[in-house]
């Protein structure tokens, strides 16, 4: 069997959509699973909406997710001459024809179809007209001479056998009157020339598959295998849209999700391997196959993604998380200020605090927020809950506790022993002392273990913060 070749073919009119990212992942996994290749084609024929920034965002998003394409990207617009040459082949074979119908005539066809309650279709009026009847003052479009009887059958690797009556498929336009190729034509020619053997894409392209199959046959080319995967819906069952939340991969990066976690989450949207939920990349490549992709739409569950991300954070080494934070910070609000604060000393403190921080955070952004106590300057700002913990009685405890802490060796065990001894001597529960201690040291009611915080901040900074809040 020849090598399997898949492709991901986004339109560069915006960010890398989360649905597109999953399509790219499925193409990549199938190619890697079969020892094949995955190619990237940028479908930039919409010149008004295609931008260099969008192309860069797509490539950057794929790289961030760990999806690597084979070879350089192929740009569809640059291949327009090749697309036109393919149409000339079809004209020469009699499988395409010139159509001179005016926009007004096409509007009338649509209106008649609407009145008769049927789908709008081109009526084929120029299909068999004598070329001598062609008006001299009008540039034609080129249409496919599609079969009018029988069926076009798609043997889809996910959807099964899908049949389209040819009477429902009209003679689609291949070249516009300005000579520019249509999407339908360009996709077929590019997939053929790129050697694509398997087209894996969203099931909203299923009708396109029938039309493109007809173009393949008109050109005398082998039709690739097709797999139309289910769309992603929001938690409410409606097609995923802006009202459900973030749509772009870049937004998930900026919210602090790890690429491995998002990759793992996306692979489970429509594909399964028993009851397993967490997969290493190696396991995904080993297990992935199209016969395990379901037909029904997958629902995007933000809470499940967050929980999975928390799992990946806890499983990451402290060094890996530090590197991930380094990559994230430039994308955060106030990035310049955050970068300026990341001195070698603060970085070392962040590394020391990481074991406790990663146990409590579900995203990198949450982790960075929880680590803010390392970076803030005195006097420490308190959030409302922390301020509420620092009652006059609590502040009095801090004032009496400081001298005891000043006398001990600065280790987690020694400071904990001193605080416990103080609470016992005062006849109060440990929480009555530890909670105000946490509020004074971090400005928040939650943090890594408080005695770890004392070690991260060090003796001088810890005592200074406690004195700031003591009565």
UniProtKB/Swiss-Prot annotation:
Any single biological process term in GO: glutamyl-tRNA aminoacylation
Coiled-coil regions, chain positions: none
Catalytic activity: tRNA(Glu) + L-glutamate + ATP = L-glutamyl-tRNA(Glu) + AMP + diphosphate
Compartment(s) where it occurs, according to its Swiss-Prot or TrEMBL record: Cytoplasm
PANTHER family from the UniProt entry: GLUTAMATE--TRNA LIGASE, GLUTAMATE--TRNA LIGASE, MITOCHONDRIAL-RELATED
Protein family membership: Belongs to the class-I aminoacyl-tRNA synthetase family. Glutamate--tRNA ligase type 1 subfamily.
Residue span of region Disordered: 113-140
GO cellular component, one term: cytosol
The protein, known as: Glutamate--tRNA ligase 1
Keywords linked to the UniProt accession: Aminoacyl-tRNA synthetase, ATP-binding, Cytoplasm, Ligase, Nucleotide-binding, Protein biosynthesis
SUPFAM superfamilies: An anticodon-binding domain of class I aminoacyl-tRNA synthetases, Nucleotidylyl transferase
Pfam families tied to this protein: Anticodon_2, tRNA-synt_1c
Cited InterPro entries: aa-tRNA-synth_I_cd-bd, aa-tRNA-synth_I_codon-bd_sub2, aa-tRNA-synth_I_CS, aa_tRNA-synth_I_cd-bd_sf, Glu-tRNA-ligase_bac/mito, Glu/Gln-tRNA-synth, Glu/Gln-tRNA-synth_Ib_cat-dom, GluQ/Sye
Motif 'KMSKS' region boundaries: 239-243
Known role: Catalyzes the attachment of glutamate to tRNA(Glu) in a two-step reaction: glutamate is first activated by ATP to form Glu-AMP and then transferred to the acceptor end of tRNA(Glu).
Tagged with keyword Cytoplasm: yes
């Amino acid at each position: 069997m020849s090598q399997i070749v898949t492709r991901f073919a986004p339109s560069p009119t915006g960010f890398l959509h989360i649905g597109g990212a999953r399509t790219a992942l499925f193409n990549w996994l199938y190619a890697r699973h079969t020892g094949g290749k995955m190619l990237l084609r940028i479908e930039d024929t919409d010149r008004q909406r295609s931008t260099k920034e969008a192309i860069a965002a797509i490539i950057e998003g794929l790289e961030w997710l760990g999806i690597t394409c084979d070879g350089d990207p192929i740009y569809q617009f640059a291949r327009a001459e090749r697309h036109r040459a393919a149409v000339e082949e079809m004209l020469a074979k009699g499988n395409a024809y010139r159509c001179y119908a005016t926009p007004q005539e096409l509007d009338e066809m649509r209106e008649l179809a609407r009145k008769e309650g049927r789908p709008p279709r081109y009526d084929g009026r120029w299909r068999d007209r004598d070329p001598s009847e062609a008006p001299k003052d009008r540039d034609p479009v080129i249409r496919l001479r599609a079969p009018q009887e029988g069926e076009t059958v798609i043997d889809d690797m996910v959807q099964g056998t899908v049949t389209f009556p040819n009477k429902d498929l009209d003679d689609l336009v291949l070249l516009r009157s300005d000579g520019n190729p249509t999407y339908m034509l360009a996709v077929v020619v590019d997939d053929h020339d790129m050697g694509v053997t398997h087209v894996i894409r969203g099931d909203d392209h299923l009708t396109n598959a029938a039309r493109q199959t007809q173009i393949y046959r008109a050109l005398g080319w082998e039709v690739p295998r097709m797999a139309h995967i289910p769309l992603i819906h929001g938690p409410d069952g409606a097609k995923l849209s802006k009202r459900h939340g973030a749509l772009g991969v870049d937004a998930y990066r900026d919210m602090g999700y790890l690429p491995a976690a998002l990759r793992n989450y996306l692979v489970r949207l429509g594909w399964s391997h028993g009851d397993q939920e967490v997969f290493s990349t190696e396991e995904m490549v080993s297990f992935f196959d199209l016969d395990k992709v379901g037909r029904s739409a997958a629902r995007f569950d933000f809470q499940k993604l967050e929980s999975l991300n928390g799992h990946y954070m806890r499983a990451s080494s402290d060094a890996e998380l530090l590197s991930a934070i380094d990559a994230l910070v430039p994308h955060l609000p106030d990035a310049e200020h955050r970068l300026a604060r990341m001195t070698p000393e603060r970085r070392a403190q962040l590394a020391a605090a990481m074991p406790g921080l990663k146990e409590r955070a579900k995203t990198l952004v949450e982790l960075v927020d929880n680590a803010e106590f390392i970076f803030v300057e005195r006097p420490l700002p308190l959030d409302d809950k922390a301020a509420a913990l620092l009652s006059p009685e609590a502040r009095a405890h801090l004032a009496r506790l400081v001298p005891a802490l000043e006398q001990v060796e600065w280790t987690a065990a020694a400071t904990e022993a001193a605080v416990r001894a103080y609470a016992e001597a005062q006849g109060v529960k440990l929480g009555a002392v530890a909670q105000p201690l946490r509020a004074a040291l971090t400005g928040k009611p939650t943090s890594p273990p408080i005695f770890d915080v004392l070690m991260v901040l060090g003796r001088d900074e810890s005592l200074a913060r406690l004195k700031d809040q003591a009565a």
